[in-house]
Design a protein with these regions (language model features):
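A compositional/biophysical signature of low hydrophobicity enriched in polar/charged and small residues
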Residues: 1-76
């Protein structure tokens, strides 16, 4: 199944709200809060790579408090 890991950089204090919102998205299978340059890692899976890209572009990147993302497409 097509998937990607998305590293999210968030506004300070918005992490828990973003994690809650991510867990409510059907395409998001796992969410981790991490320390370092990025604050959250989300695993996105869907039936097609186009749907994965659409989810990242229109859902994850538009969540309130998300400052930037880095997407890692899984190849195998």
């Amino acid at each position: 199944m097509p998937s990607a890991f998305v590293l999210l950089n968030t506004q300070i204090g918005r992490e828990e709200n973003i994690i809650r919102d991510l867990k409510n998205l059907e395409e998001v299978k796992e969410v981790f809060r991490v320390y370092g340059v990025y604050d959250i890692i989300a695993k996105v899976e869907s039936g097609t790579m186009d749907k994965v890209k659409e989810t990242i572009t229109w859902k994850l990147r538009n969540l309130k408090g998300v400052k930037s993302t880095l997407t890692l497409i899984v190849t195998k």
